[in-house]
Every structure is written in structure tokens, then in C-alpha cells.
């Protein structure tokens, strides 16, 4: 597989996409959504092969859940594409403008990034999410999914490229690296003549490899330990609801709860309520102070070194008792709080201190960490959740897939 030729084709496609009308891009997206549902049987059959091979390879239940497609999830993916159609196209919009003293009208206008390379693991829905958002913003994309999703992705890419042809857009607008060879990933990371941005979606190892080997700007996202701190002023009953939702709704998601921090003044009462709710569902990994309050809760073990640095992605939850909001914040600073973190409190002082001190991409007061999601934020599906500070942060929707150019208009103006 010649990635240089793929890069050349992608750059050419990006040139044409940059001037495609919103109507033409939306037409392609509408066809993708319809074809996903029309080809559901074929797509689900391919996904079943991936699931079977995953089980044979000993993948965890959490990974298999990420891999799984069913009719409900496929319909949801199609509807996410339709939602992207309904969103405003940012390309060509003016960010701001001003009139200069010399008579020039100067503005910043949104433009596509160009070619986006995305490397991701066992989530076939990512293939559609990325293709849809890149198409809407006039970007070409080169995708490389994990070997665990090979058969699913092959069928999904067929749907995408068929839709592109029907909408009279370049088929190379969305390309897929079919071979699982890691050497091809290394080659992709060096295609700086053709690719403008790399987005890795996966674990810490993938992010580290991309940062260390890429000659292309890399957006780091997805990985991070998510925390909830239950303050002494919190409504304990409602806090139990939020903690349960953050942990149990979809534990394999990157915004699911990893570590629970509880103020010592309410730890005994709160953990008693929480353990009743989580019994039979979640394994607690407790520090010494929390352990002393968990007598009688069967599914628990002592926390060891590294546990509070673990993104569980499963029905496991770290628990620690802290003295106050300051200790909670200090713990989070040490243990990679960069994704989604929340405080349960009725204290304005505590909430503002938490918001201003915690360095995460998304910070919540009295809300679940599960809200860090493009659709939940009204952005449509996202290509990633960025946990860095440049070029984008948090869920990356349409605007985050654009750059801008300066546009100056004048009456044959010359510089004096």
C-alpha cells in the first residue's frame, strides 16, 4: 500500500472539497445516513465477524462493547450523521472583521484544515463520525482503524465512498488504510507534505507513539483520569445518582468515572448510600480511609500503586477519602486530571475554586462526567475529545476542524 499516493490523492480531494457547496456536502451526508440503514444487514454481519475474532483473541468485555454494532447503535450513528447535516457549515463564515484606517476591510474567514489523518482503535462508529465531520468542513481524511474492526470498517468505508460518488465528490475525500501493519502508521505520521493534522484516538501508548514519531501536528485526546469530588455541602442522594450515571451508564467510554474523591465529613454517610446502589455492579478499589468505611461491601480491594493513575474503562472505581476540596484538587493534579472532572457541592466558594484550579478540558458542577461529548454539547458527533490546550480543547466538532485565513479587501490600495 503506497501511502504517498494516498496522500497525494487526499490533498487533491481537499482542494475540491474546500470549494464544495454546503448543499453538495449535505447531499453526501444524507446518502451516507440512508445507506447505513439500507445496508444494516451487511454491516452487522461484518461486525459479527469482528466480535467473534475479538472473543477468540481474548478481548475484554469493555473492548468488545466498544467494538459492538447492533441495529440500535447503527440507527444512532445514521441519526448522528443527519444531525451533522442540520448544523451550520462553518466554512466561509467570518470570525471577525474591522475597517483599517487605510481603507482596507480586513476579516478572518474560516477555512478547512486540509487533510486530517485519524488513527483509532476498536470503535467502528468513529469511522462514520470522522468522515461526516470532515466532509461537512471540507476536509479530506485518511483513516486507520484497529485490526479489531477490520470487517466492520471495510463495509462502512464502502458506504461512504459510494455516497461520495453519488454526490459527485472525490472518492479520495475519505480513504482508509486497509492493512493493519504498524509500519504504515509510522509512514502516515511522516506524510507532512500532504497531511495537515493527526488525531490519535486510543490509549496512552498510541498517543505517546504519535507524539514521538509524527512530523505532523498531533491533537492528543481521549485519555485522562476522570474524577468526581463529593464536597461536604453536597446533596448526597443526588450525588449518588450522578456518580452512578458517570460510572455505570457506559464504563468503556473515555468520559466515564475512574476515581471518586469524598470529603471526610460526609464520607461515611455517602459511601453507605453509594454502596447500596452499586452492589453487584461495580468493584471498588479503596484507599485505607475509604476501606475502613466499606466493611460489608464484597466487591472491593485495596488500592495499590498505579490504581489512581488507571483509566479503568470497566466496572471498576477508585475511591479515596480526602480532607477538603484542596486535597481533592491536589490529588487530581498528580493523577492526570485532563479529560472530564466534576464536583458535587452546594457551595459557590468550593465550586469556583474547583473550576478555576482543575486543569481538565471539561469541568462540571453537579453534573455527570458523561456529558463530555460532541452531541451532548450541541456540536454533533466529535472527531476526538482534545485534552491539550492547542489547537482545540474538549470535544472537537465542526469549528475545531477549521482554521482561518486573513482576507483584506480594498480599492487598489498600495502600502506607503
Curated annotation (Swiss-Prot):
InterPro entries, per the entry: Ald_DH/histidinol_DH, Ald_DH_C, Ald_DH_N, Aldehyde_DH_dom, G-glutamylP_reductase_CS, Glu-5-SA_DH, GPR_dom
Domain of life where this protein originates: Bacteria
Chief location bin: cytoplasm
Enzyme class, first EC level, given as a word: oxidoreductase
GO biological process, one term: L-proline biosynthetic process
GO cellular component: cytoplasm
CDD domains: ALDH_F18-19_ProA-GPR
Enzyme Commission identifier(s): 1.2.1.41
Reactions this protein catalyses: L-glutamate 5-semialdehyde + phosphate + NADP(+) = L-glutamyl 5-phosphate + NADPH + H(+)
MF terms (GO), sorted A to Z: glutamate-5-semialdehyde dehydrogenase activity; NADP binding
Gene3D superfamilies xref list: Aldehyde Dehydrogenase, Chain A, domain 1 (3.40.605.10), Aldehyde Dehydrogenase, Chain A, domain 2 (3.40.309.10)
Keywords: Amino-acid biosynthesis, Cytoplasm, NADP, Oxidoreductase, Proline biosynthesis
One Pfam family cited in the UniProt record for this chain: Aldedh
Family: Belongs to the gamma-glutamyl phosphate reductase family.
Role description: Catalyzes the NADPH-dependent reduction of L-glutamate 5-phosphate into L-glutamate 5-semialdehyde and phosphate. The product spontaneously undergoes cyclization to form 1-pyrroline-5-carboxylate.
UniProt-recorded name of the protein: Gamma-glutamyl phosphate reductase
Species annotation: Vibrio atlanticus (strain LGP32)
Gene of this entry: proA
Amino acid at each position: 500500500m503506497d501511502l504517498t499516493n494516498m496522500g497525494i490523492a487526499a490533498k487533491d480531494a481537499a482542494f475540491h472539497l474546500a470549494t464544495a457547496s454546503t448543499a453538495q456536502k449535505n447531499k453526501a451526508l444524507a446518502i451516507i445516513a440512508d445507506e447505513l440503514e439500507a445496508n444494516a444487514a451487511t454491516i452487522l454481519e461484518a461486525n459479527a465477524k469482528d466480535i467473534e475474532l475479538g472473543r477468540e483473541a481474548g478481548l475484554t468485555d469493555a473492548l468488545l462493547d466498544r467494538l459492538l454494532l447492533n441495529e440500535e447503535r447503527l440507527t444512532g450513528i445514521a441519526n448522528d450523521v443527519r444531525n451533522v447535516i442540520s448544523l451550520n457549515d462553518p466554512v466561509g463564515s467570518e470570525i471577525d472583521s474591522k475597517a483599517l484606517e487605510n481603507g482596507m476591510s480586513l476579516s478572518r474567514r474560516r477555512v478547512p484544515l486540509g487533510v486530517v489523518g485519524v488513527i483509532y482503535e476498536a470503535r467502528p462508529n468513529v469511522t462514520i463520525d470522522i468522515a461526516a465531520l470532515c466532509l461537512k468542513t471540507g476536509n479530506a481524511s485518511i483513516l486507520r482503524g484497529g485490526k479489531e474492526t477490520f470487517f466492520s470498517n471495510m463495509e462502512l468505508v464502502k458506504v461512504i465512498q459510494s455516497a461520495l460518488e453519488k454526490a459527485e465528490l472525490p472518492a479520495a475525500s475519505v480513504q482508509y488504510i486497509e492493512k493493519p501493519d504498524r509500519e504504515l502508521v509510522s509512514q502516515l505520521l511522516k506524510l507532512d507534505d500532504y497531511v495537515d493534522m493527526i488525531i490519535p484516538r486510543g490509549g496512552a501508548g498510541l498517543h505517546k507513539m504519535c507524539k514521538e514519531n509524527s512530523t505532523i501536528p498531533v491533537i492528543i485526546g481521549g485519555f485522562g483520569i476522570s474524577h468526581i469530588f463529593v464536597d461536604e455541602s453536597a446533596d448526597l442522594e443526588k450525588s449518588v445518582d450522578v456518580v452512578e450515571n458517570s460510572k455505570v451508564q457506559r464504563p468503556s467510554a473515555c468520559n466515564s468515572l475512574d476515581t471518586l474523591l469524598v470529603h471526610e465529613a460526609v464520607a461515611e454517610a455517602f459511601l453507605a448510600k453509594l454502596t447500596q446502589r452499586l452492589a453487584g455492579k461495580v468493584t471498588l478499589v479503596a484507599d485505607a480511609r475509604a476501606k475502613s468505611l466499606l466493611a460489608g461491601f464484597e466487591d472491593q480491594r485495596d488500592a495499590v500503586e498505579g490504581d489512581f493513575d488507571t483509566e479503568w474503562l470497566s466496572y471498576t472505581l477508585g475511591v479515596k477519602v480526602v480532607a477538603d476540596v484542596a486535597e481533592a484538587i491536589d490529588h487530581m493534579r498528580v493523577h492526570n486530571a485532563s479529560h472530564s472532572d466534576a464536583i458535587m457541592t452546594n457551595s459557590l466558594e468550593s465550586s469556583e475554586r474547583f473550576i478555576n484550579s482543575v486543569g481538565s478540558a471539561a469541568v462540571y458542577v453537579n453534573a455527570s462526567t458523561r456529558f463530555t461529548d460532541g452531541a451532548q454539547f450541541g456540536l454533533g458527533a466529535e472527531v476526538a475529545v482534545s485534552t491539550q490546550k492547542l489547537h482545540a480543547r474538549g470535544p472537537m466538532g465542526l469549528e475545531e476542524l477549521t482554521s482561518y485565513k486573513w482576507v483584506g479587501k480594498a480599492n487598489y490600495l498600495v502600502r506607503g
